[in-house]
Structures are given as C-alpha cells and as structure tokens.
Amino acid sequence: MNEEETNFVGIADLPNQRHKIVSRNGVAFTLMLCGESGLGKTTFCNTLFSTTIKSHMGPEKVRAKHAEKTVEIEITKAELEEKNFHLRLTVIDTPGFGDFINNSGCWESVVEFIEDQHESYMRQDQQPDRRKIIDMRIHACLYFLRPVRNGVRPMDLEAMKHISKRVNLIPVIAKADMYTRRDLALYKTRISQVLEYHQVNVYKPNMDEGDPVFHRQIQGIINCMPFAIVGSEDDIRTPDGRVVKGREYPWGIVEIENEEHCDFKQLRNILIRSCMLDLIQTTEEKLYEQYRQEQMKVRQYGEPKLRTIDNAKFKEEEENLRKRFTEQVRVEETRFRQWEQRLIAERDSLNKDLEAQHVQIKQIELEIERLKAATSSRKR
C-alpha cells in the first residue's frame, strides 16, 4: 500500500455515492406544455422522449374542446428507462389555452394549478409522516409561441409574466420550418427584446465557471434562446441514405436533430441532457421556497391557503372596482336624465307648436265659414 492510498479518507467517493443513490431511486420530472392549439405540443413531446407519451386529439375532440371555451389541465404520466436509469415523467397539457376570441385571464387557471402543486407539497411536508409525499411541482414550462410582427402577442406576454413567477419558463417558437432563417433570426431578436423589456423571467441555466467545456455548452444553449423547434414522429430517409426524424417537403427535408434546421437538440439538452437536475433544483430551492416564504408571512401554521376572494388585496381591488362601477352608473344615470329632460323639453316645445297650429287652423276654418256665410247672403 503506497502513501497515497494510506492517506485516502474517501471524501472523493461522495459523488460516486450520490450517483449510486440517484441511479437506484431514479428521478421524477414534471413538464408543462402551454400555448394555443395547433402549435405541435403533442408531437414535440413525443419527439423529445422518442416514444408516444401523449395521444393526438381527433377532430371531433378538438371541436368539443373549442365549444367548451375553458382551459383544462390534462395530466399524463409515464415511466421511462434508459440504461437502467428510471425517469418518472409527468406531462401537463393545457388544452383550450388561448383558443378563444376573448382570452383575457386564460392564464389564471394555469397559474393556480402551478401554485396548487406548491401548496400540496408544502402541506404534505408539514405532516409527521413524510415518507409518501406526492410531488407534482412543475419543473419546467414550455411556452409555445406563434410569431407575430411585433414579436409577442399581448395575451402571450401577459400570460408569461404571471407564469414565470412560479415556474422555470422556457419560451419556444413553434413550427420553425414555416419561416426562413432570416425571419427566424428576426423573430428571435424581437421576442428576446420584448421579454427583456417587460421583465419576464426566462429560465437561464447556472453557469459552471470551473468547467470551461460545460460553460461553453451552456452559453451556446443560452445564445439559441428562444428556441425555434420542429417536431416530427416520422422516420425520413435522406438522399444520402440516412434515416432521421424529420419532415419531407417538395423542396427538401427538415431534420429534427440538425442544428442548421432548428434548435431541437439545444432544447433537449436544456431539458434532459445538461440541465434537468438544475431545473429540479431551481424549482425546489428557489421557486418553491419563494412560494413557501410568501405563504408563511400571511398564514399561521396549518392554516389553509388564502383564497383569492378572501385576499385583502383582492377585496381592496373589488371595492375599488365596485366604486368605479357605481360612479360610472351614476354618470350614465345623470346623462340619461339630462337626455330625458331634453326630450321632454323638445316634446313640450313641439306640443306648443302643434297647439298653436291647431289654433291657427281653427281660426282659418272660422274665417272660411264667415266667408261662406257672407257669400250666401249676397246671392240672396
């Protein structure tokens, strides 16, 4: 036994121990897909994990969802295994989000669901027996954007503002194969500028300054944001004989994993290969802790969550809204009374004119009668 082995304590084996524990227990990961229908959320999810996680909705079901005019929460669970490592995956979809003419407040049910998962975990964590905690806290939210001229639709911007306060938000440009490289570059710049100007919290991976290779990799991922993605579950044979996931068009083939065609690989890296544990850790140590502290400041131990309608701020806003409504009603009533008085005055004026005309007509009739009587007298 040499001197190095004699002085070896074993601290350096701690990462190996951690690796064994994680490998044995696996990891639970919850992903939310948010955005209007028709942007390829289901296709992307199945492409991301190289298996069918979610089934596509048929035309009848899509029409039924549109008729309901409500945002729903759909939960899909799956157990994935790769090289003896288990991933307990939960996918949260939001059918109906942003699909209606009036989409004001459509994000409220999504934010409420995210907060409910923090609330559920916090209440379970306060129980004596915490061995069977059900953790549904959402680790990442992919927000699918349809590019517009000014970068982001007002509804999407407002939704991302609220959602980003509770979850790791990752905006993506859906169906990138519909745009030219020039258009995509322009959309990316505009979207980034809008999000930065309005202070929307977009997830940024932690940079490891001590690992130059990993640092460059993460910097490359950040430079690609917002990710322009293409999804496909079909295998396509390229002219050079390769079989790839992609889409075939008359002008050529779009390869999903070709970085010159889209940012799918970079998005997969941030979600799975490079930053999944960072997403989980950020959720647990930052976002959940922030929610827990906020609730502890306004609640006693064991007290149920303050509902929106019981919130003092909400009541104040409700009272202000009631006052504004009352004032508006008063103004409208005053305006109506003034309008009514003008109508009455006009009616009275018209009635007076009408009476005067009746008097004139009577006088004319009497004059005619006198003239007739005078004419008859002369004839006699």
Swiss-Prot record:
Tree of life domain: Eukaryota
UniProt xrefs under PROSITE patterns: G_SEPTIN (PS51719)
G4 motif: region residues: 174-177
Transmembrane segments annotated in the record for this chain: none
Any single GO CC term annotated in Swiss-Prot or TrEMBL for this entry: microtubule cytoskeleton
Gene3D superfamilies: P-loop containing nucleotide triphosphate hydrolases
Broad class of where this protein is predominantly found: cytoplasm
Protein name (database record): Septin homolog spn4
Gene: spn4
